[in-house]
Amino acid sequence: MALKGPQTLEENIGSAAPTGPCGYLYAYVTHNFPIGEASLLGNGYPEAKVFSLPLLHGLTVESDFPLNVKAVHKKIDATTASVKLTSYHREAIVFHNTHLFQPIFQGKGLEKLCRESRELFGFSTFVEQQHKGTLWSPEACPQLPCANEIFMAVIVTEGFKERLYGGKLVPVPSQTTPVHIGEHQAFKIPLYDEDLFGPSRAQELCRFYNPDISRYLHDSIFTGIAQALRVKDVSTVIQASERQFVHDQYKIPKLVQAKDFPQCASRGTDGSTLMVIDSLVAELGMSYGLSFIEGPQDSCEVLNYDTWPIFENCETPDARLRALEVWHAEQALHIGAQLFAANSVLYLTRVAKLPQKNQRGDANMYNSFYLQHGLGYLSEATVKENGASAFKGVPVSALDGSSYTLQHLAYASSFSPHLLARMCYYLQFLPHHKNTNSQSYNVVDYVGTAAPSQMCDLCQGQCPAVCINTLFYRMKDRFPPVLSNVKRDPYVITGTAGTYNDLEILGNFATFREREEEGNPVEDAPKYTYWQLCQNITEKLASMGISEGGDALRTLIVDIPSFVKVFKGIDSTVEAELLKFINCMIKNNYNFRENIKSVHHILQFACNVYWQAPCPVFLTLYYKSLLTVIQDICLTSCMMYEQDNPAVGIVPSEWLKMHFQTMWTNFKGACFDKGAITGGELKIVHQSMFCDLFDTDAAIGGMFAPARMQVRIARAMLMVPKTIKIKNRIIFSNSTGAESIQAGFMKPASQRDSYIVGGPYMKFLNALHKTLFPSTKTSALYLWHKIGQTTKNPILPGVSGEHLTELCNYVKASSQAFEEINVLDLVPDTLTSYAKIKLNSSILRACGQTQFYATTLSCLSPVTQLVPAEEYPHVLGPVGLSSPDEYRVKVAGRSVTIVQSTLKQAVSTNGRLRPIITVPLVVNKYTGSNGNTNVFHCANLGYFSGRGVDRNLRPESVPFKKNNVSSMLRKRHVIMTPLVDRLVKRIVGINSGEFEAEAVKRSVQNVLEDRDNPNLPKTVVLELVKHLGSSCASLTEEDVIYYLGPYAVLGDEVLSLLSTVGQAGVPWTAEGVASVIQDIIDDCELQFVGPEEPCLIQGQSVVEELFPSPGVPSLTVGKKRKIASLLSDLDL
């Protein structure tokens, strides 16, 4: 976010932000407004009085709506106004005429469930505030249309949402402005802080306060932030956040007196340390985390609702609704992962310390404190810092032992019925995974018998098909168990990937950045980077008709010779590029054998809130992910500072009064650019000394009188994060780790008997079985399993014995060679993946990596499908049912959209499409080398915990290969849903399209690079005919020179052959042209003779050459044999 280059420190998005109000009230005219689309984007439920829509240009705000603003806060004196830089919150909260919109989830009783769950786990409830003054009402605003013709929403800045919660914002109706948003009209009324109008006229202000909006903010936003900070008193978090932003109280502790601590872990010396570190981490998370959220952000294409690619081919409103439904189904994969993973960021409940017996010397000291998962800890009793009881715990009878319950799902949704409704909507797209222990599971019987019963305390049996109890029954086996772990696990976060990711098989290998970063002089020798190598391989494969999108196997391979030709062509292409790559590394003195040991996959997590998926659930996940990473980073700094300043005998609040400001200053330098988070500090200025404002006294009276005032920026320096850098180590380090971990990476020394059926060609041999052997009835798997067990070749009807022998020999030899060098443990399923696996395996072998398997990274991408709706009762809607037979009749013939994951998409390809990512990570801390005492941190890729997360994450068995459980440690996964081609248009550059002539030239150049071809002109002519056909008859000399490029010396021969073909009158096809030029140029074999070999040279006899004259040394002898030659010439 910090600007670099020729720009000055003051030239940034913060300084460019205009001055403006703290928020707006929008009144949307219902005519032409897309009510149905907005309903799918909202988070309403049947009893909801308010709901939210995402902040989108073309839907909720106009196209030129400023995302960053220097919001006017108060008057410092009669001529000066104080402004605070902040960005707008991602939601528009609808509060008037909400009945026009359909609920996103139709189940009833969500408010009751969330309210009871909140009380069960000891979290504070919302308390409506009483206002003595006049409250604003849309009916009393003459500038707006009739109340029945509009619906209204409030849009507020991040910094002033606490003021909106407390009813401290004042509308100024005299500044009502009509705007056009997409195809509909709206009116907006600015909201200013009550402090702007001064205390003398406070009683005359008409404030905006809606208790339903305040309840929404309390439940859907502030409760999630409180959970991330491990504080159960939500009102304290709101008050602290308001004081921090409005009164600039960033450097003083604000939460510690509201913190409660586990009763069992707060005793003794370790208990005092744990309480202090927990409080300090929460305070730093509050100060820095909320400051990051409030800061300025860059705009992005995701916000442009009018240009979403998912709507491009939609000609009817129903088609647009269907496109939104499919998009939401694809997003459901991420929500399911967060709810089903035991190590989800939603389930972090406490700060813990590793037991002494689990710590391995000094290497683990910096990671001894960590953020602990475990829903079981929610039931434990807690105490205040002085030992007074805070929460008595959850009664055993209130929950279902170690089983996941609806109360835990309500906790995961921050006890917000709006977020819970949206989560349930996503869960409806996910299939159930029946557990073999749940023999009684039957959705049809449950919906027809148990669900309609009045015993349901949420819907009383009135809507069994859409009741949350029915949904939970269907998905129950996938939720994690409720445990109290004592283990440091990675935590799963969700957000959007950054722009630059190194996700090829070898990640950031051979980027040549290390030497430049270390201060070494930049060499003049051209650098052939690993990234360029991958790009060149992709382009070479594309010229052969092989692409990442689809290989067109059946077009390229039509028989056995073409099968061998295609794969040999790939092999030769890979070998040629690999040789160039290695030679370049040698020329640049690049120590690739050592550098390969430290390569990583690098995945960026974007800290820009506007890049997140437009959904309130994803917004909550972003807030929690960012706050969690910040707290995880500062754990080590807090631990080390507490060791130097022990807290024994001092309560956390007193200790923080003495030390928090110092710790806040120290963490400022330890946060950015230390490994995990990148960012910068912005210096905020205002370009003009004055800004346009209005006379506040006149505004109270309903009049608008413009005025100009001086501007004073409250905080001139802001820290803004940019990305979280997540790394995945590729090469196994044998320095530490248990034997079980080492066994998971160890490559077996013996060759497998099934090296063919488990090798790189089996996928293609099976897919093309009928193409290669059209008359055989034997299955491909059986045939090649037998071929791999013997040295003989089979006899198959209709297949040439010569061709079959060639195919078997190639597959056997290549499979054995692949087995020897393969340390990636991947089986290719496309021609592109075959080429990349072969290339990277060869690189690893050249670097000496042959003993251990490398870590591989795969991505799970969503695939939607329509299936019969018998197992998905929500398709019926809120209807009554009386029996299973009635349910079967009503659901018969219906279909429903569900989503599954696939591993077919390449992670390197998806990584370039700005995907939504759900990724497990753990932040490890370490000190620098060579005596550097600074603490650095690294966000390392981890693993998903839980069998219900996704079926592709469970331990698999590779065909004919025995894998132990620890072998899954070398297979890492990321869930990705690309935004490009869905919400963001693919960027098409000026030179992105390729002309036909360029493709032809590239094909001709590839032919000319074959140095073993004795008849290059003949091959060039055939290649030109293949691409141009009859157009070859009119090729000029300039055309031929262009296609030949640096081989233009062959131009005359090629033109001569083309002229001959034209005179022959044959059709311009490959067969016709070949029949003519075959007689002109025949293949010939050259014989070369060495300088010492006997031959007749210029009439000299062989005898004279073998027996030279005495005293005359032989001229045909090499340098190294000069003495021997002289001795042989002497007449002894």
From Swiss-Prot:
Keywords: DNA replication, DNA-binding, Host nucleus. Disulfide bonds: none annotated. Residues 1103-1132 are annotated as: Required for nuclear localization. GO terms for biological process: bidirectional double-stranded viral DNA replication; DNA replication. One of its GO terms (molecular function) is single-stranded DNA binding. Pfam families: Viral_DNA_bp (PF00747). It is found in: Host nucleus. GO terms for cellular component: host cell nucleus. Homooligomers. Forms double-helical filaments necessary for the formation of replication compartments within the host nucleus. Interacts with the origin-binding protein. Interacts with the helicase primase complex; this interaction stimulates primer synthesis activity of the helicase-primase complex. Interacts with the DNA polymerase. Interacts with the alkaline exonuclease; this interaction increases its nuclease processivity. Belongs to the herpesviridae major DNA-binding protein family. Plays several crucial roles in viral infection. Participates in the opening of the viral DNA origin to initiate replication by interacting with the origin-binding protein. May disrupt loops, hairpins and other secondary structures present on ssDNA to reduce and eliminate pausing of viral DNA polymerase at specific sites during elongation. Promotes viral DNA recombination by performing strand-transfer, characterized by the ability to transfer a DNA strand from a linear duplex to a complementary single-stranded DNA circle. Can also catalyze the renaturation of complementary single strands. HAMAP family: HSV_DNBI (MF_04007). This is Major DNA-binding protein. It comes from Human herpesvirus 8 type P (isolate GK18).
